């Protein structure tokens, strides 16, 4: 559960309505893989990740980034039940993919940076604070099934 004021929730959902999920998702996942290269080990099947340009131009990275932000959108629609919303993804990432749950926090922080870049002055410090609460809640929900 994420504790947002009514104003914060409105601001988060209003901005999210302007997000180009295809573009932002690919950029966020790509930046995660470039900035934290050890995360690439989970994406070896994506092909060429040999350089920042290769990562950022990789169509599989872009497609998976879109998928990730689609799940994030679902979370925004269910802020009062993030653990339930992400239960299956948590189990998948824990039991089958063996993803370090710290990576969820890292991706959330990268997403906030990408949103700030895309929205400039519209992404106020107050809006950033609200998004930090949301990405922390999502990361916590995704880590829930870990033992």
Swiss-Prot record:
InterPro entries: Globin, Globin-like_sf, Globin/Proto, Hemoglobin_b, Hemoglobin_oxygen_transport. Pfam families: Globin (PF00042). Heterotetramer of two alpha chains and two beta chains. The modification Phosphoserine is found at residue 45. One of its GO terms (molecular function) is heme binding. CDD domains: Hb-beta-like (cd08925). This is Hemoglobin subunit beta. The modification N-acetylvaline is found at residue 2. The modification N6-acetyllysine is found at residues 60, 83, 145. The lineage of its organism: Eukaryota, Metazoa, Chordata, Craniata, Vertebrata. Belongs to the globin family. The modification S-nitrosocysteine is found at residue 94. Red blood cells. The modification Phosphothreonine is found at residue 13. Involved in oxygen transport from the lung to the various peripheral tissues. GO terms for cellular component: blood microparticle; haptoglobin-hemoglobin complex; hemoglobin complex. The keyword Transmembrane does not apply. Residues 3-147 form the Globin domain. GO terms for biological process: hydrogen peroxide catabolic process. The gene is HBB. It comes from Ateles paniscus.
């Amino acid at each position: 559960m994420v504790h947002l004021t009514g104003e914060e929730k409105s601001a988060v959902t209003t901005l999210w309505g302007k997000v180009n999920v295809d573009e932002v998702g690919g950029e966020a996942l790509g930046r995660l893989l470039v900035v934290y290269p050890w995360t690439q080990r989970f994406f070896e099947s994506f092909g060429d990740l040999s350089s920042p340009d290769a990562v950022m131009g990789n169509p599989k990275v872009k497609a998976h980034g879109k998928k990730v932000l689609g799940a994030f959108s679902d979370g925004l629609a269910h802020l009062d039940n993030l653990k339930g919303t992400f239960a299956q993804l948590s189990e998948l990432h824990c039991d089958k993919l063996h993803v370090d749950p710290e990576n969820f926090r890292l991706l959330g922080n990268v997403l906030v940076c990408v949103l700030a870049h895309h929205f400039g002055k519209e992404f106020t410090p107050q809006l950033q604070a609200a998004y930090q609460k949301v990405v922390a809640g999502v990361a916590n929900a995704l880590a829930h099934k870990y033992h």
